[in-house]
A protein has these predicted regions:
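N-terminal membrane-targeting/pre-transmembrane regions
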Residues: 1-53
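General beta-strand recognition
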Residues: 19, 95, 125-127, 136
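Hydrophobic alpha-helical transmembrane segments
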Residues: 53-66
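Helix-adjacent hinge/juxtasegments
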Residues: 63-90
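Membrane-cytosol interface motif
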Residues: 81-107
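Phosphoinositide-dependent membrane-docking surfaces
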Residues: 94-96, 106-121
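A membrane-cytosol interface segment of integral membrane proteins
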Residues: 128-162
Length: 162
């Protein structure tokens, strides 16, 4: 969970709509992570080169393999570093936007016909239902806070947007 916990639960009002914008909790910037991976790769390459210099020629290919694994891990982390989900509550609609990896999903529900399921939240995402259409929210909120978030969203849906 990112940012201020109360803002993540209570939501933010921008004058015309309520919204909840939650992001993945990452404590290190991509630039710092790139530096760490580069240093680890250089150390591994240095160790492999020293062993190669002394005649142990099979260590260097494994060092290169290790660097490739580090590169794959860095790319995976970079793809998911900007994951987020956003729920926007306007006067007539509920918009849910979720970016996971390279995939962007958007769902729009009619506010007057949408219900928030607050009963079955034990270790599950918040379920917003409009008839047979389902949408989920709360992936980046701690499990213990999801019920409070669901209650807050439900309360904001009942009250009119000023």
């Amino acid at each position: 969970m990112s940012g201020n916990t109360s803002e993540n639960i209570l939501g933010t009002f921008d004058g015309s709509s309520w919204y909840w914008h939650n992001k993945r909790n990452i404590s290190i910037s991509p630039a710092q992570l790139a530096i760490i991976f580069a240093v680890l790769g250089l150390v591994s390459l240095l160790i492999g080169s020293v062993f190669y210099w002394y005649g142990a020629s099979l260590i260097l290919p494994f060092s290169v393999l290790e660097i490739a694994a580090l590169l794959i891990a860095f790319v995976y982390n970079a793809i998911h570093a900007n994951d987020y989900e956003k729920l926007t509550l306007t006067s007539d609609a509920v918009h849910i936007e979720r970016k996971i990896g390279l995939t962007l999903q958007q769902v729009q529900l009619m506010r007057s016909m949408t219900r928030v399921d607050k009963t079955s939240l034990q270790n599950q995402l918040i379920e917003l239902r409009q008839g047979h259409q389902l949408a989920y929210f709360g992936q980046f909120i701690h499990v213990n806070l999801r019920l409070a978030l669901a209650k807050q969203i439900s309360a904001r849906m009942i009250s009119p947007v000023i």
